[in-house]
Amino acid sequence: MGNCEGFNRRAFLGSVAVGVGSSAILTSNAQGQENKGQENASAKPEQTQQFVASYPILQNVTETSASIAWALNTPSTGWVEWGTTPALGKIARNSEFGLNPFEEDFLSARISGLAPNTKYYYRTATAAFSYRTAYDKSATEPQYSDVYSFTTCGPNAKSGSFFVMNDTHNTIPTIREHVKLADELKPDFILWNGDLCSFYMDAQHIKENIANPTNSPYAAERPIIFVPGNHDRRGSWARNLKKCLTTWEQDDPKFYSLGYNYAFRQGPIAAILLDTGEDKPDWHPAWSEMANYEPYRELQTAWLMKALERPEIKSAPYIVAFCHIPLYDKNPKANPGNILDRWASFQWPCCQMWSPLFEKYGVQLAVAAHQHRFSYAEPTKDRSWAQIVGGGPEMANACSIYCYADENEMKLTCTKLDDKSELGSWTYKPRV
């Protein structure tokens, strides 16, 4: 992890923290029997401290909702102000069990009740918050981000597009080059297809490599969609990744634990997000009995069947599935992911469960990663769907995947990141 670049907070926060009071402190000291005699106690946070450690990260935009997360430098509370004009006017908070949020490293909020294919504006608000006792607490004036905008997705959009980067493994120069190319192509969303980092040991690692890898608002208006990779499950902080990369809201509580599985429409494209889990079986000694993916994949299969039956998915001209570990490998000796030897080249257990559903419902393309080398597999008589696999973390083998679709065709292009040469392009006709 030594190749992670340091975070220049001074330069960054000079541009992101606006509307900050210089000395005002908002103090809440509720009256009650327990706090008598404590009214003058002080627990004031330092007002001159910069509380925000990243620009907003727009994520998981659907027809009716969106989520925003941002990183912190100090324990804080916060919210998102939003509306259909830059004047905003509404507030979203990530409240739970009657309590507004109070976090040390990341804040997030989900905006709901939105309309499809509609432009919205938002900004984040962050106030450092401190407790001395249960009733003696104080907050600073909020720090506000700039006002940003996004457009909800929906089936009525005339076109749809996406950009895929994968296996960045905390290689910040590669991430920045991906983002630079995405800025030129202007896709509807960026899909980060797993192995964002090699492992996760603390919040700072996530802040540097995911929340703010470019020292710019790279995901403030173009949403990031996260598909987990096997390395995204490793390390003591892996279970906290959802603080920064928020999970989707599931319609059926039975599938609540499938936080990163989702299906949505962006114009003519139906996107299916799947989680292939780890690259070794649950009983592999490397996991020390900490892996439990077999029932997780079975639950995903039940979810996938329901997702593909949804009218807006079933009627899509194009259906694209995204997963980190490939579901197919042309090498008959490739590691299938269910043996003790080394690590999986592809995920045969997932393929056995999901490929029949791909066949039945007409999934045309699986977008995968993991192998650190580009490949494309055309459909065959035994497999009706194509598969593209992205490259690796180093510039020499990194590549980006871009897709644009309208009512006539869906075109997929893969580009080498170092010299921008084209590795190939493929077109797909509407399935319905």
Question: Where in this protein do the model-derived segments appear?
Answer:
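C-terminal segment of N-terminal export signals and the immediately downstream linker at the start
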Residues: 26-67
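N-terminal active-site segment of His-dependent metallophosphoesterases
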Residues: 53, 60-68, 73-79, 84-102, ...
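Short, flexible loop/turn segments at beta-strand junctions in immunoglobulin-like
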Residues: 111-116
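Active-site neighborhood of phospho(di)ester-bond hydrolases with catalytic His/Asp-centered motifs
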Residues: 164-166, 190-195, 224-230, 320-323, ...
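A short C-terminal boundary segment appended to hydrolase-like catalytic domains
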Residues: 404-432
